[in-house]
Amino acid sequence: MKISLNGISVQHPSAKPGAVPALREQNLTVRAGEQLAIIGPSGAGKTTLLHLLACALKPSAGSMLLNDQDPWQLSRGALQKLRGALFLAPQVPPLPPRQRVVTAVLAGRLPNESLWASLRSLFYPTDIALAERALAGFDVGDKLFDRVDRLSGGERQRVGLARALVSQASLILVDEPLSALDPTRSQHAIETLTRAAQERGATLVATLHHVEMALAHFPRIVGLRDGQVAFDLPAAEVTPELLQALYAQHLHELTGLANLEADDLPTDPAPVVMHCR
């Protein structure tokens, strides 16, 4: 799916009048089938950007086109059909606690199924082999018939990612998919996700705190800070200097990044601000 953002600003519905928009005057073009990672410090607007692309938030200014269509100019039925081609995997997947994992995974197909098929699948999953393959891709194939409330946080996160594999989405949006995973499982999860997107020709947009993982597995990196695009570059062109500027006052979020040497970090510690009440 193609993406085109032109002068986009987004204000959260709950924001106070006059508040600074969560996203400001963003321009971004993504080709169909492209894979990119969005990085930046906490509060940069990464999750807001994904919700915008998922048509969950309406822009307050500018325009957004998905496959040359403005979602907010479509009829309700056409918008629902467009949303069926999108898949958003939030950082904490909304999995019903008493549901079996197989049912939770196959819910990734619901936007493209009839009402009757959707209701039937809640009680009689119809493609168990598909769910098992998707779970196996994230090393949780043995959890197929477990209840969701018996899974660890990392297992739940991988079940949420397995949903993306069974969906028919042409735009896959993934928010911090590695936050509950150890380094080995993080590596495997990203490889599974990027390979699956490439095989089906889907566009993949992922927000990542793991900068080193983003640079290693995504050909294009978008740096976001204070609701604006700081840089949009091939991964090979993202330098330690750019990362320093992007994460200024948030350098602790770059801890462990191999290509950011100790000499690159500032020698003077940032001032500590204490709030008393």
From Swiss-Prot:
<keyword id="KW-0067">ATP-binding</keyword>
<comment type="similarity">
    <text>Belongs to the ABC transporter superfamily. Phosphonates importer (TC 3.A.1.9.1) family.</text>
</comment>
<keyword id="KW-1278">Translocase</keyword>
<dbReference type="GO" id="GO:0015416">
    <property type="term" value="F:ABC-type phosphonate transporter activity"/>
</dbReference>
<feature type="domain" description="ABC transporter">
    <location>
        <begin position="3"/>
        <end position="251"/>
    </location>
</feature>
<dbReference type="GO" id="GO:0005886">
    <property type="term" value="C:plasma membrane"/>
</dbReference>
<protein>
    <recommendedName>
        <fullName>Phosphonates import ATP-binding protein PhnC 2</fullName>
        <ecNumber>7.3.2.2</ecNumber>
    </recommendedName>
</protein>
<keyword id="KW-0918">Phosphonate transport</keyword>
<dbReference type="InterPro" id="IPR027417">
    <property type="entry name" value="P-loop_NTPase"/>
</dbReference>
<keyword id="KW-0813">Transport</keyword>
<comment type="function">
    <text>Part of the ABC transporter complex PhnCDE involved in phosphonates import. Responsible for energy coupling to the transport system.</text>
</comment>
<comment type="subunit">
    <text>The complex is composed of two ATP-binding proteins (PhnC), two transmembrane proteins (PhnE) and a solute-binding protein (PhnD).</text>
</comment>
<keyword id="KW-1003">Cell membrane</keyword>
<dbReference type="InterPro" id="IPR003593">
    <property type="entry name" value="AAA+_ATPase"/>
</dbReference>
<dbReference type="GO" id="GO:0016887">
    <property type="term" value="F:ATP hydrolysis activity"/>
</dbReference>
<keyword id="KW-0997">Cell inner membrane</keyword>
<dbReference type="Pfam" id="PF00005">
    <property type="entry name" value="ABC_tran"/>
</dbReference>
<keyword id="KW-0472">Membrane</keyword>
<dbReference type="GO" id="GO:0005524">
    <property type="term" value="F:ATP binding"/>
</dbReference>
<dbReference type="InterPro" id="IPR003439">
    <property type="entry name" value="ABC_transporter-like_ATP-bd"/>
</dbReference>
<dbReference type="InterPro" id="IPR017871">
    <property type="entry name" value="ABC_transporter-like_CS"/>
</dbReference>
<keyword id="KW-0547">Nucleotide-binding</keyword>
<feature type="binding site">
    <location>
        <begin position="40"/>
        <end position="47"/>
    </location>
    <ligand>
        <name>ATP</name>
    </ligand>
</feature>
